[in-house]
Amino acid sequence: MLELKGKYGKDCKVFIDNVEEAALSTIYSILDDEVSANVPVRIMPDTHEGVDIVIGFTMPISDRVNPNHIGVDIGCGVTCGRIPKMSMSLAEIDERIRAAIPMGFAHRSSLHPFASENSAMEALATKIGQDPQNVYRQLGTLGGGNHFIEIGEADGDWYIFIHTGSRNFGLQVCKYHAAKAKANGSKYLFGNDM
């Protein structure tokens, strides 16, 4: 584990011993910004360079936020759950998952059923200049990169692991708010703009 200090950020822990230079430089740039003063900064072991921030970065915020620190993959995370054993093999389950869930750049040909229940998402998509229908066709799909669905067995039980993401929608939300901050002459949003 590394413990780092910058001009303002004095309580930073990186939960790995070796960090690539570009990521380390980005971490120090945040520790040298007053946004990191008097708050704990924690960096997860899978850290690597992102946009204005490293992946795996966590820090409480109060009076300001940099949209790029929230990131372009809003909702990204990993979840795990135990599932009932099925009569089919893991290979058959994998085949069914691949048939049912669009992956990579693919999306649904019809709207996800959630579309009829969520006017808030439609309003947000419209606000940031995105076609809500396109957003709804991406719901319940699996992006590319390091996103995955995995079924495994441990101690006689079956588990499903899913690394989720927001697809292009998260990128567009971030771009909208970053442009708003830039229009205000800052990289941060303050108060009601957050």
Per-region residue spans from a language model:
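Hydrophobic residues embedded in beta-strands of well-ordered beta-sheets
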Residues: 158-159
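Glycine-rich, flexible loop motifs
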Residues: 1-41, 47, 57, 61-69, ...
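Positively charged, aromatic-enriched nucleic acid-contacting surfaces
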Residues: 50
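A short acidic (Asp/Glu
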Residues: 54
